């Protein structure tokens, strides 16, 4: 269903089946409708949502390298200085990977919901599933 928003932009409002069996045309609080124009003007449209399987977080090899670097105890000052610089570089690389991981995690869908909101959403989805299963059973039992 296409409606005009208060600022005269076209919004796509999909009908939603509520837990009590009613069809609701306004969106749920968990999935707000934002027009494509509003998304791109707010900078939202550029972010794509990742899944957990798509996360690229590799920190163990760097941590291993840092531990190996710290365990080395060279006797010469020149070697100590070079090893110290290598360790600092690896630590900086680890910090960059942590920041990259934070950015990726921020793109996960639902990450901005707290535990209670997630539980409410899960309960709503379970109720919808039960209702749809009942409707399917009722439809299959109906003879034409």
Swiss-Prot record:
Component of the Mediator complex, a coactivator involved in the regulated transcription of nearly all RNA polymerase II-dependent genes. Mediator functions as a bridge to convey information from gene-specific regulatory proteins to the basal RNA polymerase II transcription machinery. Mediator is recruited to promoters by direct interactions with regulatory proteins and serves as a scaffold for the assembly of a functional preinitiation complex with RNA polymerase II and the general transcription factors. The keyword ATP-binding does not apply. Residues 85-143 form a coiled coil. GO terms for molecular function: transcription coregulator activity. Component of the Mediator complex. Keywords: Activator, Coiled coil, Nucleus, Transcription, Transcription regulation. Pfam families: Med9. One of its GO terms (cellular component) is mediator complex. This is Mediator of RNA polymerase II transcription subunit 9. The keyword Plastid does not apply. It is found in: Nucleus. One of its GO terms (biological process) is regulation of transcription by RNA polymerase II. Belongs to the Mediator complex subunit 9 family.
């Amino acid at each position: 269903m296409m409606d005009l928003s208060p600022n005269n932009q076209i919004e796509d409002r999909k009908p939603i089946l509520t837990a009590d069996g009613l069809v609701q045309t306004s969106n749920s609080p968990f999935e707000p409708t934002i027009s494509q124009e509003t998304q791109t003007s707010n900078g939202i449209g550029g972010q794509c949502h990742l899944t957990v399987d798509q996360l690229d977080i590799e920190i163990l090899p760097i941590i291993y390298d840092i531990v190996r670097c710290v365990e080395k105890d060279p006797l010469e000052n020149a070697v100590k200085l070079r090893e110290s610089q290598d360790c600092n570089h690896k630590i900086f690389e680890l910090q960059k990977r942590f920041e990259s991981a934070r950015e990726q995690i921020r793109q996960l869908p639902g990450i901005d919901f707290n535990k209670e909101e997630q539980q409410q959403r899960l309960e709503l989805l379970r109720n919808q599933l039960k209702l749809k299963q009942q409707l399917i059973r009722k439809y299959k039992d109906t003879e034409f």
